Amino acid sequence: MLLTTPFVSSPVRVQGNGGSGASPWAGAATALRIQAAKQLTGRVVTTKADKTVGVEVVRLAPHPKYKRRERIKKKYQAHDPDNQFKVGDVVELRRSRPISKTKHFLAVPLPPRDTRRKSQLLPPLQSQSQSQDQDQPPTPPPSSD
């Protein structure tokens, strides 16, 4: 029997016990593999150490009892070889080989987000352009003296 789930990239074959009544999902727990995140995004909170930045990563997780999503913050140490980041910068953490006891990520700059507002990206509405025309005083025609 094949087990398909959105959490596994390929179907997993599960050995059933024929008609014994055992659940086909019983052996699936051992066949699934959980992988750690390869890249995270966070904000630099400290730059005191040389070639190291402290990055705070915020994620949403459900509360065990109340099921309401809550913010969970975790701080990672990341390698910054050029000391280029400042406190408040948003960086991407990429998993790498262990650099020290606590550093397992490399800090990479993110491209700046587009700061233009939606109103600047879209053309004005027809009603907005007419109201702007009415607000402007009429310009006198050029005199031909």
UniProtKB/Swiss-Prot annotation:
CDD domains reported in the protein's UniProt record: Ribosomal_uS17
Record keywords: Chloroplast, Plastid, Ribonucleoprotein, Ribosomal protein, RNA-binding, rRNA-binding, Transit peptide
CC annotations in GO: chloroplast; ribonucleoprotein complex; ribosome
Keyword Repeat recorded: no
GO terms for MF: rRNA binding; structural constituent of ribosome
Feature: compositional bias, Low complexity: 120-136
Entries under Gene3D superfamilies matching the protein: Nucleic acid-binding proteins (2.40.50.140)
Subcellular location as annotated: Plastid, Chloroplast
Superkingdom per UniProt: Eukaryota
Region ranges (Disordered): 101-145
Record has rRNA-binding as a keyword: yes
Biological process annotations from GO: translation
Matching Pfam families: Ribosomal_S17
Transit peptide, residues from-to: 1-36
Family: Belongs to the universal ribosomal protein uS17 family.
NCBIfam families hit by this protein: PRK05610.1 (NF004123)
HAMAP family: Ribosomal_uS17_B (MF_01345_B)
Subunit comment: Part of the 30S ribosomal subunit.
Role, per record: One of the primary rRNA binding proteins, it binds specifically to the 5'-end of 16S ribosomal RNA.
Protein name listed in UniProt: Small ribosomal subunit protein uS17c
Provenance organism: Oryza sativa subsp. japonica (Rice)
Upper classification of the organism: Eukaryota, Viridiplantae, Streptophyta, Embryophyta, Tracheophyta
